[in-house]
């Protein structure tokens, strides 16, 4: 791949004019050596390990940002799923552990901490169930703790008992947190990855090292401007522009990850090259799709345009780093993307269309606000639909949905900061209650038999 002098200038402009940033440096921390049958001892061990390993993360990010002139927006921590770490306590609530995570994260100054999680794709242990039932109060009583539940996989199928409980958990969290904000910190996955640096779904997988650095980059504005300034006419040429731009974005993330690894003396794990939008004008995935030729994101052709974008980003990123991992693609969070917000408000971008888009993009239904009266079984049905797409297509899918108590279609909810605001989107009138209440497990598909 040849590099022209104009491309070097473009790289400089990425930061100055196009909202390019390193979205996060995330340290993953293994907590297995913190296990104790005494929950107070466990909490003490967790606090000590997180504050010891993560104490220099924020300062390191500041030094690297100043050295290279690249904004590093967030510093985060992910930990081993707490349902695994807390099982020996036999406690009936893990809220105190969530509060310990919150205190530890605040003590070292990070933005978020993830890993208040349970992996229940094939069944729930007593500890898994305790954790899931602890989520509403944990979200109510903490500020920066994020939670996730993996309810399915291509190899295991979909655990519908866990899907039902997840829907009830989200509904309960919405009822006890202001405007359902606690739900913005809960993700329900199918095929969750163990090295995700992004919140709210990050956790530190059991196959990872004792500590690891994972980096997430962001550059929707860079891609959009590259397309606007290119001479691309055919979609083949559009894909080539996106691929070359993703290469440049990825090289920056690789540099930051390697440097952070040296400074912190922690191994570099992966670089997640997902295009992660923000509510800022010019930092939108939806606007990239419109630049390709759509009048509005959500119209016919949107899924195809998103597939092109997602694939080109991966191809460009793979050439720039041998450590690509995480989710790596394009995020479509409604409340965090100015173009998605506008498309949803116009009525063109619907929940159904977003579901179709998730079949070809990085994750799933993300930061979607729905009426507060939405029943738990409907939320479970939405989760099951999304999980089915992930299970059949052997990809990660997820749901981060916010039922906003007291609000209905036509209103909106303001989350602030990177989480933005979202119009309340309609859900289907029909009921899936009988289907969800059947429970059991949707068997793994035939494509799970790969050996």
UniProtKB/Swiss-Prot annotation:
- Mind telling me which Pfam families this protein's record contains? DUF711
Q: Which domain of life is it from?
A: Bacteria
* Family label: Belongs to the UPF0210 family.
CDD domains for this protein:
RNR_PFL_like_DUF711 (cd08025)
Assembly and oligomerization: Homodimer.
Source organism of this protein record: Actinobacillus pleuropneumoniae serotype 5b (strain L20)
* Name listed for the protein in its UniProt record: UPF0210 protein APL_1491
């Amino acid at each position: 791949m040849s590099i022209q002098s104009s491309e070097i200038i473009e790289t400089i402009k990425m930061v100055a004019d196009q909202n390019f940033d390193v979205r996060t440096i995330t340290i993953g921390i293994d907590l297995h050596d913190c296990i104790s049958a005494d929950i107070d001892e466990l909490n003490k061990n967790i606090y000590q390990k997180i504050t010891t390993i993560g104490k220099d993360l924020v300062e390191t990010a500041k030094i690297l940002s100043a050295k290279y002139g690249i904004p590093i927006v967030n510093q985060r921590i992910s930990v081993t799923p707490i349902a695994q770490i807390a099982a020996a306590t036999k406690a009936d609530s893990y809220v105190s552990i969530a509060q310990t995570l919150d205190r530890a994260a605040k003590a070292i100054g990070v933005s978020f901490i993830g890993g208040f999680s349970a992996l229940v794709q094939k069944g729930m242990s007593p500890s898994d169930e305790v954790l899931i039932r602890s989520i509403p109060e944990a979200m109510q009583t903490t500020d920066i703790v994020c939670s996730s539940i993996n309810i399915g996989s291509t190899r295991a199928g979909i655990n519908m008992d866990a899907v039902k409980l997840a829907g009830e958990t989200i509904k309960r969290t919405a009822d006890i947190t202001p405007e359902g904000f606690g739900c913005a910190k809960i993700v329900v996955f199918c095929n969750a990855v163990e090295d995700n640096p992004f919140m709210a779904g990050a956790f530190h997988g059991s196959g990872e090292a004792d500590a690891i650095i994972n980096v997430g980059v962001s550059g929707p504005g860079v891609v959009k401007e590259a397309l606007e300034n290119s001479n691309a006419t055919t979609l083949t040429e559009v894909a080539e522009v996106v691929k070359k731009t993703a290469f440049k974005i990825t090289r920056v993330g690789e540099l930051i990850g390697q440097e952070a690894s040296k400074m912190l003396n922690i191994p570099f794990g992966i670089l997640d090259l997902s295009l992660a939008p923000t509510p800022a004008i010019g930092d939108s995935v939806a606007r990239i799709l419109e630049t390709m030729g759509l009048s509005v994101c959500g119209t016919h052709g949107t899924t195809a345009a998103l597939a092109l974008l997602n694939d080109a980003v991966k191809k460009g990123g793979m050439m720039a780093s041998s450590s690509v991992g995480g989710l790596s693609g394009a995020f479509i969070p409604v409340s965090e993307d100015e173009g998605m917000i506008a498309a949803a408000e116009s009525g063109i971008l619907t929940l159904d269309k977003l579901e179709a888009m998730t079949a070809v993009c990085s994750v799933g239904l993300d930061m979607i606000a729905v009426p507060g009266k939405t029943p738990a079984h409907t939320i479970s049905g939405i989760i099951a639909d999304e999980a089915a797409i992930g299970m059949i297509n052997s990809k990660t899918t997820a749901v981060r949905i916010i039922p906003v108590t007291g609000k209905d279609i036509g209103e909106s909810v303001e989350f602030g900061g990177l989480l933005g605001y979202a119009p309340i989107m309609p859900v289907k009138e029909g009921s899936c209650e009988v289907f969800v209440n059947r429970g059991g497990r949707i068997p793994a598909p035939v494509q799970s038999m790969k050996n």
